[in-house]
Amino acid sequence: MKKKHRIKKNDEFQTVFQKGKSNANRQFVVYQLDKEEQPNFRIGLSVSKKIGNAVVRNRIKRMIRQSITELKDEIDSGKDFVIIARKPCAEMTYEELKKSLIHVFKRSGMKRIKK
C-alpha cells in the first residue's frame, strides 16, 4: 500500500476508534470514519499478540494489505478505516480472508464492492 493509503499515528487511530462507526464479523472489526476533505481512503491495521507469534501476525497483515490493493478501486475515497483482525484469521487462506473482508466492508455500507 502506498503511503497516502496508510494510517500510522496513534492519535489518528484513536480518532477513528472514538468518532467512527464499527462493523464486525467473526474475523474482523472495521471502524470507519468519514473525512470528505481527504482525496483518498486510508487504512490502519491492528493484529493483536493474542492471535499468534510475529510470523502469523505479519502473514495476516500481508494478506489484508494484498486484499486492499486488489479492492482499492472499489473502496470509497474520503474515509479512514481501521481493520482489527480476530483469532479465526490465523487459520484462514487468502481467498477466505479476502471474502470475509469484502463481507464486512459490504456490511459497513460500501455499495461499490461487487466481488
Swiss-Prot record:
RNaseP catalyzes the removal of the 5'-leader sequence from pre-tRNA to produce the mature 5'-terminus. It can also cleave other RNA substrates such as 4.5S RNA. The protein component plays an auxiliary but essential role in vivo by binding to the 5'-leader sequence and broadening the substrate specificity of the ribozyme. HAMAP family: RNase_P. Coiled coil: none annotated. This is Ribonuclease P protein component. InterPro entries: Ribosomal_Su5_D2-typ_SF, Ribsml_uS5_D2-typ_fold_subgr, RNase_P, RNase_P_CS. GO terms for cellular component: ribonuclease P complex. Its EC number is 3.1.26.5. GO terms for biological process: tRNA 5'-leader removal. Belongs to the RnpA family. Keywords: Endonuclease, Hydrolase, Nuclease, RNA-binding, tRNA processing. It catalyses: Endonucleolytic cleavage of RNA, removing 5'-extranucleotides from tRNA precursor. GO terms for molecular function: 3'-tRNA processing endoribonuclease activity; ribonuclease P activity; tRNA binding.
